[in-house]
Amino acid sequence: MNKLIYRFNNQGSQSLFNSKDILGGKGANLAQMAKLGLPVPPGFTISTKVCEYFYRSNKKIPKKIIQETKKEISVIEKISKKKFGDLLNPLLVSVRSGSRVSMPGMMDTILNLGLNDKTVIALKNETSNGRFAKDSYRRLIQMYGNVVLGIESYFFEELIENYKLTKGVIQDNELEEDDWDGLINNFKELVKEKT
């Protein structure tokens, strides 16, 4: 396999401008913005070739990709001065799927990867906003449950709606930090039940 992971950050990009076939649309656009000097957070794109290999190889991720991904996360940690899994200053990342052509609403995303029962406390302390931190963690569980584990979003949404009914509120933003704690526990139970 040739080069499979392409880095981008505010120092530029390792990829070619018109490389949607290799990077997908989002990856190519991020690379182009980085090359133009626009402020983009540090990140990397895993080549579309890896997806092709994944499906040809009985849904196995090559060890080389796992090693390179860990290396790229280390680069992001160095640039951001955050560390994946750190209890004081955790690195949070988003994982976004992409294709050669735009497919709005069809591609999956997982936000807040890096949050867990411990790192959510660091996010709360960093932002001074427990409700935001817990809601972010709840979203991670929901997205991961749906995208990776195949649990229908409906089940998560139903838990939220039922919880709001018991609290007598209409909007998600009316829920307090303790409410999100309760929903996080409910979401974890749902994941256990469905997997």
Per-region residue spans from a language model:
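Nucleotide/phosphate-binding sheet-loop regions of phosphoryl- and nucleotidyl-transfer enzymes
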Residues: 1-195
